[in-house]
Amino acid sequence: MEPPGPVRGPLQDSSWYEPSAELVQTRMAVSLTAAETLALQGTQGQEKMMMMGPKEEEQSCEYETRLPGNHSTSQEIFRQRFRHLRYQETPGPREALSQLRVLCCEWLRPEKHTKEQILEFLVLEQFLTILPEELQSWVRGHHPKSGEEAVTVLEDLEKGLEPEPQVPGPAHGPAQEEPWEKKESLGAAQEALSIQLQPKETQPFPKSEQVYLHFLSVVTEDGPEPKDKGSLPQPPITEVESQVFSEKLATDTSTFEATSEGTLELQQRNPKAERLRWSPAQEESFRQMVVIHKEIPTGKKDHECSECGKTFIYNSHLVVHQRVHSGEKPYKCSDCGKTFKQSSNLGQHQRIHTGEKPFECNECGKAFRWGAHLVQHQRIHSGEKPYECNECGKAFSQSSYLSQHRRIHSGEKPFICKECGKAYGWCSELIRHRRVHARKEPSH
């Protein structure tokens, strides 16, 4: 019997691929985990995907939900949850297996992807896993969608390491040294970068020195030097290079020191550490990266509020918190003049003026202004009712419905008529009662 041919369309033949209330609940749990992760990483500039609305703009807890364009991020979150789920986190073996199925489906999306695409996801994941540690951050920073793209990134990196033909030029004496000229050729820095492609046990230099020299190769590689170096635009430092350098710098004890002449020295065990001259712009870029490195969290909350004693991992979070005490609201809406403590709250508020509704339901296409409203709406499709009454066990899809239901047990009547003082448990009852007074009023 011949084996079946490859499946070309999305996989749809298993019942546990279908969306369920369990899948929606897991999506919400993973979204909360994503928001906490982003907060720990100090990514203040990232857009907050899930907000509770303008009435809760002062709350510091914000949630994240998946949007079109953020699919790769959420897919990576589900992949990590699938790989790192622990048995102790689940009520029992059946629940553990069920949650793994849900996370696997949300990561690989068999209802959307073909068998070949799913195999490519798995091969790419394993390929990135077997890469040397020094290259994993580099390749992941390019967000490859397939194994071929990952290989292309590595091949491009290797091409950059190929030695260039030496062009003879006039010798320069010490008096002719330029402000940002290296005393040795660029080939030494590129050679240090090539060391990162070797296995760890064969690397002749400490990690920090490799990263430092690699960083120098990035900020100085500009091809042939022009005659007028004063007008040369400084090579920019890319986000990926910054990330790689910061990660390596955080794991090493070497010290980088800037002298008053703009010369950066690497104080390292190797006595042959290079001495390099940079332009002021390049030195400032390096200083900014060192500042970013100092913000890398150690897990300790070292930043304490002098007003209330609350502590934070990031100093930037402390600055935002202190506005609660000072009342400062530096972000102002240009349309209505309303002010806010955080820029993210201003961005949410501006949706009222623009009419933007970025949160769209995948089931019916209905759009919402706030992520919380989308979550509530999706419970209509999933049938999820997470809010349960402690008195009678009745469940509800929204917390407001549960609050209204509890008045039946408590006898609370918060809606009071201003005319006669009569109280009601429901707003609709008060509205009907007011019509009685309206009919009794004499007509003019």
Curated annotation (Swiss-Prot):
GO terms for cellular component: cytosol; intracellular membrane-bounded organelle; nucleoplasm. It is found in: Nucleus. The keyword Nucleus applies. InterPro entries: SCAN_dom, SCAN_sf, Znf_C2H2_sf, Znf_C2H2_type. Residues 161-188 are annotated as: Disordered. Keywords: DNA-binding, Metal-binding, Nucleus, Repeat, Transcription, Transcription regulation, Zinc, Zinc-finger. A zinc finger (C2H2-type) spans 303-325, 331-353, 359-381, 387-409, 415-437. Signal peptide: none annotated. Residues 79-161 form the SCAN box domain. The keyword NAD does not apply. It holds the Pfam family zf-C2H2. GO terms for biological process: regulation of transcription by RNA polymerase II. Its main location: nucleus. GO terms for molecular function: DNA-binding transcription factor activity, RNA polymerase II-specific; RNA polymerase II cis-regulatory region sequence-specific DNA binding; zinc ion binding. Ubiquitous. Higher expression seen in the liver, testis and ovary. Belongs to the krueppel C2H2-type zinc-finger protein family. May be involved in transcriptional regulation. This is Zinc finger protein 232. It comes from Homo sapiens. The lineage of its organism: Eukaryota, Metazoa, Chordata, Craniata, Vertebrata.
